[in-house]
Curated annotation (Swiss-Prot):
Species for this entry: Roseiflexus castenholzii (strain DSM 13941 / HLO8)
Subunit record text: Part of the 30S ribosomal subunit.
A cellular component term, taken from the record's GO annotations: ribonucleoprotein complex
Protein name: Small ribosomal subunit protein uS10
GO biological process: translation
Keywords for this protein: Ribonucleoprotein, Ribosomal protein
Matching InterPro entries: Ribosomal_uS10, Ribosomal_uS10_CS, Ribosomal_uS10_dom, Ribosomal_uS10_dom_sf
Function: Involved in the binding of tRNA to the ribosomes.
Pfam family, one: Ribosomal_S10
Family: Belongs to the universal ribosomal protein uS10 family.
GO molecular function per UniProt: structural constituent of ribosome; tRNA binding
Amino acid sequence: MAKQKVRIRLKAYDHKILDQSARQIVEAAERTGALVAGPVPLPTKIEKYSVIRSPFIDKDSQEQFEIRTHKRLIDVLDPSQQTINALMKLNLPAGVDIEIKL
């Protein structure tokens, strides 16, 4: 019989909050006896925007902005019901997007 795997993908704009959340998830899973692979840092998505500074003329003067989306991947191998309950009860900080696949 194949072992069950829970794949957790985390996304955030702030890498410090993201690493803190990943650490909380790994600690909760390890406390219940599940095997954990990760957190694996995935490539950071960088979106760049150029905006003209002047409201009327001077296209040569532009300002650049960027948004960095940091991502982490955590695999919980062979989780028990206790592991899933512990992960559901975690209170993670705002600003972290969590995607869970069974």
